[in-house]
Each structure stands twice: as C-alpha cells, then as structure tokens.
Amino acid sequence: MKILSLECSASPASSAVTEDGKILAYSFVNIKLTHSQTLLPMIENTLKSAMLKFDDIEGIAVSCGPGSFTGIRIGIAAAKGLAAPKNLPCAAVSTLYSMAYNFADTDCILCAVMDARCNQVYNAVFDIEDGKITRLCEDRAILCGELAEELKKVSQNTNKCVIIVGDGTEVFYPFARDIEGIKKSGENNRYQNAASVGLAAAEIFDSG
C-alpha cells in the first residue's frame, strides 16, 4: 500500500511516501514560511522523487499531535482535502507514537518527549523489541521530575537502554542525566518526521 504521509506538528514540516515498510521518498523543509505555503509544493516534490503520480497513492496519513495546534490543523485539513476526491482512507497518527518508528530496528525503551513548557513535556514510553513496538503508557503531559522518577524505576527493571527522543530532549534530559542506562538520541533521528508517520500508519491500515 502506497501511503502519502504528512508531518506538520512542529516548526519543520515533512512529507513522505512509504510502501510495505519501505521509504520511497522523503522531503523536509524548515524555512520561515507557514506550513500552508510549503506543504503542497513539498508534496509535489515528494511524489516526483518517488516517481509517482497522486493517482498511485492508496492512503493518506497525518500526525495528529501533540504539537503546534496551527500546524496540526493545517496538516489534517490538507490530508482531508487530498483524500476526499478519491475517497482514500486516512490515518491519524500520534506524533509521539510515530517517533518510536525512528528506532524500530533498535531494541530499547523509547521515551518520546515534546516540550510543553513550565518544566513539563508531552510524553509516551514504548518498549521496542525485534521490531515490535509496545506502548507502555498513553500520550500525556507530565512534569519532567515525575517522568525522571518513572524512568529510574524502568531502568532498574530492564537490561535495555532507555533512549530519549523528541524536541523536548534538551528540556527533559537534565532531570534524568544521572540515571544509569539513559541516553539522548542522536540529532539525525531525534525528531518527528513524515516517514515514521507513514510507517506507523501502515499498521493502522493493516488492522482495518
């Protein structure tokens, strides 16, 4: 199933085409224009890179937050607008859940965090093993100190590394830096992206 996916939950925006767990094309922009200005040209570029036409697309996926209210609204509106003429199926994917797919090939405990200000983060925690992602808690807003205490207990009860991912990493990590077994993700796979949204959406489409 060829899926066109959109990610607009933060200042950067991205689009991707995925099929059967493979990324066919990916585009990313982080310039001082609104998502409403950049999204459609970016989608055209992504389809061109994948050597596809829109008629080849079989499903649309979009991140649904948490994140920027304006960005999420633009992304969802674009997804609905693209899907409606062909009656394509749509999948709304949690921004936090999609980031777990950045590490789908790494056995670890994945802690996704997005800055919610006032020493809080939007958060979800996942157990990843042999490519299977298991959610350990629902998406939530939580104080950084409380999350650090939770991860301390998790770290004590697993042999896996606990990896911090997301744009809230630098906000949260000082609260957890002294906990054994916790590390920050690298910059190259730290942030939300449309390719991971598409990979996560495939699971939603497969489940009906």
Feature locations, PLM:
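Surface "functional belts" at beta-alpha junctions
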Residues: T34, P89-R190
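Short glycine/serine- and small hydrophobic-enriched flexible loop segments
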Residues: E44-N45, Y101, L199-E203
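Phosphate-handling active-site elements
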Residues: K48-D55, A84-T95, S207-G208
